[in-house]
Design a protein with these regions (language model features):
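N-terminal intrinsically disordered, low-complexity segments enriched in P/E/S/T
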Residues: 16-163
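Serine/threonine-rich low-complexity intrinsically disordered regions
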Residues: 1-3, 31
Length: 163
């Protein structure tokens, strides 16, 4: 009887186990010359940028992180004079821990075209992102709606539509 209660208690405890929180790693994969996996330490060593955004409630919040364009260039996405012709027919698929996905074009981030500031943030208001916001978040301050700001982001896949 005691053994049955112990086993029942252990099994019940397993039902309460929660999924482990996301780890602060970010990968850039796809048809690239130098696919990357960046950890929190790697991101901390890269040049930082701060952006201000309006939250849903109208409050202004600052996010800090690394310019996504710089990460993409390190991974070997077409940039500068390479971003022409067939390279323009490509996209970036951002993937979050919870399955959420968003598409970006490479040209919208390029300084030669859209020059849109998008950062891979690890801090909000000077504090590390946590809970359902982090540990990493793509922040798109120029968007009127926040649907392309991807919380719990883990990866970007570079996809060429024309080879």
């Amino acid at each position: 009887m005691i053994r049955a209660l112990i086993v029942a208690g252990l099994v019940a405890g397993l039902g309460c186990a929660q999924e482990a929180p996301p780890v602060a790693t970010f990968s850039v994969s796809g048809d690239l010359t130098s696919p990357l996996v960046l950890k929190a330490d790697d991101l901390a060593k890269m040049p930082r940028q701060t952006v201000s955004v309006l939250e849903h409630d109208g409050s202004k919040v600052e996010y800090e992180g690394v310019l996504l364009w710089e990460i993409l260039k390190r991974a070997g996405t077409p940039a500068d004079k390479q971003l022409r012709g067939k390279a323009m027919a490509s996209y970036l698929l951002a993937k979050a821990h919870d399955g959420y996905q968003v598409v970006f074009t490479l040209a919208e981030m390029s300084p030669e075209f859209g020059n849109e500031t998008i950062i891979l943030a690890d801090k909000r208001g000077g504090q590390p992102l946590s809970g359902n916001q982090g540990p990493l978040k793509l922040v798109v301050p120029g968007d009127k709606a926040g649907a392309r700001s991807v919380r719990m982001v883990e990866a970007i896949e570079f996809v060429k539509l024309l080879k």
